[in-house]
Curated annotation (Swiss-Prot):
<dbReference type="GO" id="GO:0010181">
    <property type="term" value="F:FMN binding"/>
</dbReference>
<keyword id="KW-0249">Electron transport</keyword>
<comment type="similarity">
    <text>Belongs to the flavodoxin family.</text>
</comment>
<protein>
    <recommendedName>
        <fullName>Flavodoxin</fullName>
    </recommendedName>
</protein>
<dbReference type="Pfam" id="PF00258">
    <property type="entry name" value="Flavodoxin_1"/>
</dbReference>
<keyword id="KW-0535">Nitrogen fixation</keyword>
<dbReference type="GO" id="GO:0009399">
    <property type="term" value="P:nitrogen fixation"/>
</dbReference>
<comment type="function">
    <text>Low-potential electron donor to a number of redox enzymes. NifF is the electron donor to nitrogenase.</text>
</comment>
<dbReference type="GO" id="GO:0009055">
    <property type="term" value="F:electron transfer activity"/>
</dbReference>
<keyword id="KW-0288">FMN</keyword>
<feature type="domain" description="Flavodoxin-like">
    <location>
        <begin position="4"/>
        <end position="62"/>
    </location>
</feature>
<keyword id="KW-0813">Transport</keyword>
<dbReference type="InterPro" id="IPR008254">
    <property type="entry name" value="Flavodoxin/NO_synth"/>
</dbReference>
<dbReference type="InterPro" id="IPR029039">
    <property type="entry name" value="Flavoprotein-like_sf"/>
</dbReference>
<dbReference type="InterPro" id="IPR050619">
    <property type="entry name" value="Flavodoxin"/>
</dbReference>
<keyword id="KW-0285">Flavoprotein</keyword>
<dbReference type="InterPro" id="IPR001226">
    <property type="entry name" value="Flavodoxin_CS"/>
</dbReference>
Amino acid sequence: MANIGIFFGTDTGKTRKIAKMIHKQLGELADAPVNINRTTLDDFMAYPVLLLGTPTLGDGQL
């Protein structure tokens, strides 16, 4: 298991695309991105470092 977990939420797929780009740059340091809808607390706790990607609406509102 890698040291970095990448988790994302997406409405249109753009956040997933960015998560995959980040994963590619980090290589073996990070596991493959996971949609937060398929995640449990134990999944988060498995990593010492988390990267969380969230979608925005309109002009960047969360």
